[in-house]
């Protein structure tokens, strides 16, 4: 963060822009800026299978509420969202076309991308990529699919919805 470079976000956006078939992501937090949200949506709109796995049970209610404010715009563009039902997942993984992956400490949230000292490993053409994809699929098997409806996203939690909408105005601070 001290050099002003947004390396983590730029790598994620680059993978999304170069993807031809799939981008599979597991992240505990989803607090997106416009550029990253646009890259996710654009990839899905051009036919890439973009699939996010997020926690079904939050560790931070405010971050959870804020993440859900991104669901409907993403879903409306064809991004698939699933929530891991056994509990909270803290994995940070992105795998693109089964050929490249990023695994590390970088969350898909503003603080992680802009303010924290995070790191990750970018991999291409290495033997562990099939295992990373298999782990995504195994995790997906334990998920609830989020449908592109308010009811599916918010599950009748009106207070959580209200909190999320209010927090969206101060998202960069969270």
Which ranges hold each PLM region?
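Charged, low-complexity intrinsically disordered terminal segments
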Residues: 1-174
